[in-house]
Structures are given as C-alpha cells and as structure tokens.
Amino acid sequence: MQVSPRRNAAQQSFRTLFTLALLFLVPIPSRAVIVRGTVTDPLGAAIPGARVQLIQGKTSAGSAIASPDGSFEIRSTASGRFVLLTSAATFAVNIGQNFYGGRTDLITRNPTLEIASIVTQVTVTATGIPTPIQQASSAINLIPFSALQERVGVIDDLRQSPGINAVQQGQYGGVGSIFVRGGNSDANKVMIDGVTSEDVGGRFDFGTVSSTALDGFELYRGPNSVLYGSDAGASVVNFTTPRGGTLKPVLNYSGDAGNFHTYRNEVTVGGTHNRFDYYGAFSRFDSSNALPLDRYHAATSAANVGYHITANTPLRFTIRNGVSATGAPNAHDFFGISAAAKQADQDLYSGATVENRYHEKWHNLVRYGIARKREQFTQFYPVGEKIPVFGFDTYFGNTVTIRGANGYSATGRGAINYAGVYPQGNDQSSLRDELYFQSDYTFSPHFVGLFGFRYEDERGSYNNPGFFQFEKIKRTNYQYTLQFQGDLFGRLFYSLGGAIERNNLYGTAGTPRFGLAWVPVRPGNQLFHGTKLRANIATGVQEPSLLSEFNSLYKQLSDAGRPDLIASYNVHPIQALRSRSYDIGVDQNIFNQQLILKAGYFHNQFSHQLDYVDSGTLKTVFGIDTSTAFIYGALLNTLAYRAQGFEGELQYAPNSHILLRGGYTYLASIVEQSFSTDAAANGTSAQNPNLPGIPIGSSYPLVGQRPFRRPPQTGFFSALYEGTKWTAAFKGAFSSRADDSTFLSYSDINGDNTLLLPNRNLDFGYAKLDAYGTYAATNHISAFAELGNLLSQQRIGPVGYPGLPFTFRTGLKIRVGGD
C-alpha cells in the first residue's frame, strides 16, 4: 500500500513535535556548575536551615537552604571564581575561600560555622587533612596574617604562643631559634607551603625570615614525625604564602623608615582571572643596628600561582627566595668591641603541587619540593690587641666586666681572634629535593583514612680551608605513613597513626602517634558550655646535622682509615635523636564563647641526644682508645634529659572589635645523663680559678642541671583593637632567667678560665613590650607606626649578645585596584 506524500509529511511533523516535547519534558544534563556540601558546626554536627549563597563578584549566582542533615546543593549556569557565603541563626557568618567552577563541574564545599564571633580556625598540620581546631587533640596556635602586617620578621610573634621560647642572638639579622616545650632548637620541623625548609638535621634560622608574603603560620607543639618524618621531634612550624583572591588585580605598596638607619619597602600584587589565581611580593629591609659592624639587609621575593585544570584538580606553584647579609660582631659584651665579620645567607624554597578530589570522598595530592640553602661566614681581619699566649699570637678585646643574671661577674680580656691568614671563613650548603604523595579517603563523615609516602634526596657540604675541612654528604630517605581519624557520636574525636622511616644515615625508625579529644559539654552561649578534654601520645625522630655526622666517632675513625678500631669497639654510625611525649589538656568556654581558657600538662623525654665526648672519657668510660688514630673527641648519642611543665592561655573577646589574649608556661627540665667533658668531670674540667668549688659546664650542661636557654617561666599577652579607621595592638613577652654559659673556656689573657661563670640563671629575664597602630585615611591609603621594645631592655637574648634598645618605624600603605 502506498502512503500519500501528504500523510508522510504529517508523520514527519508529528515526530518532530514529539522530539521537541521530549527535549522540554525529559531532564537532560545541563551546562551548570553544581556546588554541594554539608554545613556543620566545629564539632561536625549538621546545621539545618543554614542559608548558603554562591557569590560571584558582587552578585549572587545561586543559593540554597541546608536540609535537616545539613546538606545543600546549588546549581548555576555561571562559571568563573566563586565564594560561598554561609549564615545561620546564632552563628557567625562564614566567608569561604574563593574557588573556580566551570559549567560542567561538580564541586564539594563543607562550610563550618562558629558559634562565637571569633574567626573559624582550621588546622592542617595536626592530621594532614583540614580539620576544625575544635576537633584536634593537639596543642596548636594559628598566627593570622593580620598579626604580621606591621612586623619586619616573625620572632616576636613566635613568642605569642604557650610553650615556646624564642631566642634571637643579637639584633636584626641575628640567629633566631625556638625551644618548644624544652626541646632543642633543631628539633622543629619547618615547612613553607608544605615544603620541608630546615637544614639537613633540623637547624633553621628564624632571624632571617621576613613577614613579607606570609599569610600566617601554624605552631604545632609536640612531636609529629608520623606525618612529617625526621626533625619533627618537638614541634612543627608551617608557614603559608597568600593567594590571589580579587577578581581585579590589586597592587599594595608599603614603605617605612625608623631609627638606626632603618628603612623598608614592600610591593605585592595579586588577583584572579578565570582559572588562574596569582600573587607576587618583593621587599627590601635595611638597618645599621645599634652596634658597630652590624649592618643588616635582606631582600625577599615570593610568588604563588594556581591554575584549575578542572574545579576539582588544581595545580599550584610556590616559590620563596631570601637573600640576606649581616655583620657578625660576636658576643659584643664579652669583648667590648665588634668582630669584623659577615654572615651571608641565600635561601630558596619552591614547590609544585597537584591535587584531585574524586567523587567527593577520595582526595589525592602530589608535591615536588626543593630547598636550596647556602651560607658563607667571612672574618675580614682580626680585631683587638695581638698578644702571644703559649707561643701563639692571639687577639684580645678590651677589658670588660661580664655580669650574669645570677650575680656572678668576671673581669678580664677575652680572645676574639687568632693568628692566621685573613680574610678567612667557611661556607656550607644544605640542599634537598623531596617528593610527597598523599591519598586520603572519607569512608564516612565520621571516618577518614590517610596514606602518605615521602622521598628525600639530601646533599650537604661544609668547607673550612683554614682547618683543611672539605666535607660532603648525601642521604636518600623514605617514609611511609598510615593514619586514621574520625569521631564517635560527634563528641569523641580520635587520630591514630604510625610511620616507618628509612634514613640513609641511621637506618629504620618507627614513630607512632595517638590523640583523643572528648567534648562532654558542647559549645553554647551559656556559662561554661563548651568543654574539650584532649590527650596525645607521640614519638619523634631527628636526623643528625651535617656537622654532627662529620664529628661523629664512626666518621672520624673511617676518615682516619681505622676500620680495625671500628670493628674492635663495635662503633656504629651516629644514631637518630629520639623524643617521646605525652600531654593532656582542657579547652573550656567560660562565658558565651567570649572568654575561653586553654590549659595543659606536658611530659617530654629526649634521649639519644648528642654529647661531645673527649678522648680521655672515651677511654675511661667506654673503653675506646683513640690515641693511635689521633682523635681528641667525638660526638656520641649519650645525652638524655627530661622536660615537663604546664601551659595555659586565656582569650577574651568582649565584642567584634577587641581581642585580649594572655599565656603562661612553667617548664621543669633536667639533664639526666651526659658524658660530655664537663659532665664526666662533674664540672671541674674547666673550673674558674676565681670561683673555686663551683662546678661549671663550659660548653654543655651538667647532670642534674637545666639544659641551656630553657627558662622555667615564660609568658605573653596581646591586646588588639580593630575599628573602621583605627587598628591598634599592644603586645608583650616575658621570660625568667635561664641557664647558659659564656663559652669562654681557656680564653682569658693567660689562657685560663677566669671568664667562665656558673651556669645557673646566667641569662637575664626580660619583659619586651611593643605597640602598633594603623589609621586608614581612605580605602586606598593608610598610615602605620611600630614602637618596639618600649622598656628598652637589651638583655633579651643570650648573655653577651645585646639586643636592640627602643626602636620605632613609621610609614604608609597604598592600595591600588582590587574589588
């Protein structure tokens, strides 16, 4: 049967209309960005009814109301950079970090709302996964970007945390160190944007770190070698670089000047463009300091560039370069003159990171990082008066009286330089390439697992032509980490992990960690509503430094070609330095989430630490005769000490404009075992003839005494005000006296020990007060001033090294562009 053309055309028209109807009636995938997640409070409880807005620029691209389980989903046909604005009754508004979303992307964001007016705080250092600080079992302090805006460096803000004693040896550019809960100054893992940044062996100079291009930093108190491997024996310090966040480019300039010929210029630029975000900074700081031959300058440059391959696959590149040079006047108060020397440093840190989140639950990260650290010390010419001592020409300083905080004093002339060919000096380098892989999977909102792998290629060198030392090392290290974290009933939070590290020098080490946080009373606006009890048990491991390896007994016997002595005395390579810690604490909301108390007890045991053992002690105590190898002493893992104490912090925010903080730490530390020359002789090997019968540790603390530079009492406070036009801050740091040494053994004009003083309470206590202020004349121009060390106390550092007196800086900030 033949179909008429008219009927055939009608059938085709019907099919066309039917197809068009299906296009409208049947749902098909649309080109829309989808943002979904769950709104919770800091303890993970869902917040139903929360309003979530997707903001693009100054307009709303979509919104949603959280369901009874806190979940939400927003669809928008827009693409580009977005911010989530989340609000709910009785909670503070949360403004999230900006992110990129394409029209076909599915993005997960989980906002956390705080009950208090205090800004939401999230830690990454504690567990490797972004975690609200209220769920963390660890002792953590977050120093925000706002605290660093008027600062030159970071030393003063490191003091604004319990358990930390920050020591700077001298003035601007002087070596800066931290001793955390009694740990050594090289037992701290330092990271910049996730890249390991300390020297091989843990040494890190905080004195040359500029505040330029720092978005803040995280202070984790306690060992965490599970996540970060070697050197995280006492703490972890994590610096971060800002990211561009404005749709339009923004340029910031800051310039200031002050006394002691101090001036500083800083320029930053940042912004976003579609998939890109970018930030760059450069600064230059100069000062003559308050001592002769102690001029300091530092130039810092940094960049942070991100690109979203997809919304869930960002790629990020960071780089930070610091170049500095400072005079090295030595311990000026011991000699009355400054040494003619210079210390130069070139430090570069960089990393490239790619991460991906697959189906909301599976997150993977790969980071390649480098650290290139080089330093040179140069003594240009000898200073002082040349006087022969025991047939050798020695240069002595002026006649001075050295006074300790313990009431003892010594008068004389100390040896500041020795005969030789000038200029002379040494140089060293510490180079590291590392690859880090992390994979974490959220099995449920209450259980997360993490696996990590870290590879390190470390190289180092030390060259001292004057002593014919030309040393090089190479180490290849691996680490495997497995960690689980979660919660039970939204009240008991746990973190359990372990790591196995294979170090090229000391072999294999295992480091477990376990943490618990229990919230018996959930946070609220009532009196005493909000109680968290926390506890941690952890071990840490630290690899020896380059110089420690060079001076170990095993290395010296190997270099001397004496494998027979190594075999006869069963001498091993230098071992890992160990730490073991447990701490308990409570975080208590006292009133309306405005007055919060944090208090805790910690107990640390540091073992297998390093002693310098002379040849006589090697023979009499250990039965090792090194006379035929012409070895006069070596480093051994024979030192052990304990450090325990209490730390507390009180925070009060009466309103959104004022924040008051204060903290206190009591530290009881004691050397339990030592075979150093001083300890083996009970402090009589280098006794001051003018102080007969008083034992002195000339270079190392004695058994039963406190380790050097660990004051038993430290504290801090800060008062911050932030208004529409005015911002002001008043901060202080306090310390009691600490044990130390003048380190002037056999250094007086007769080659004797009359310039040594008893160790107990040798370093002075201090109170350092600083004030800052900023006035915003317009949205683009503001003026600021910094008043440092208001009491002009110069005995803030170790004995013999005077700090800066009262200082001031004042300048302008100019902002161009931005949203």
Predicted regions located by residue number:
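Transmembrane beta-barrel wall of Gram-negative outer-membrane proteins
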Residues: 259-286, 291-326, 341-370, 442-453
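A beta-strand signature from Gram-negative outer-membrane beta-barrel systems
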Residues: 161-162, 209-252
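Membrane-embedded beta-barrel scaffold of Gram-negative outer-membrane proteins
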Residues: 276, 361, 365-369, 373-377, ...
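Short, acidic, small-residue-rich periplasmic hinge/interaction motif at the N-terminus
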Residues: 40, 51-53, 87-91, 102-148, ...
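Short acidic/polar hinge/loop motifs at secondary-structure boundaries
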Residues: 156, 195-221, 301-303
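Structural signature of Gram-negative outer-membrane beta-barrels, strongest in the C-terminal barrel
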Residues: 442-446, 454, 470-596, 600-604, ...
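Gram-negative outer-membrane beta-barrel transporters
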Residues: 487-494, 603-605, 625-744, 779-782, ...
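Extracytoplasmic beta-strand/coil segments of soluble accessory domains associated
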Residues: 155-196
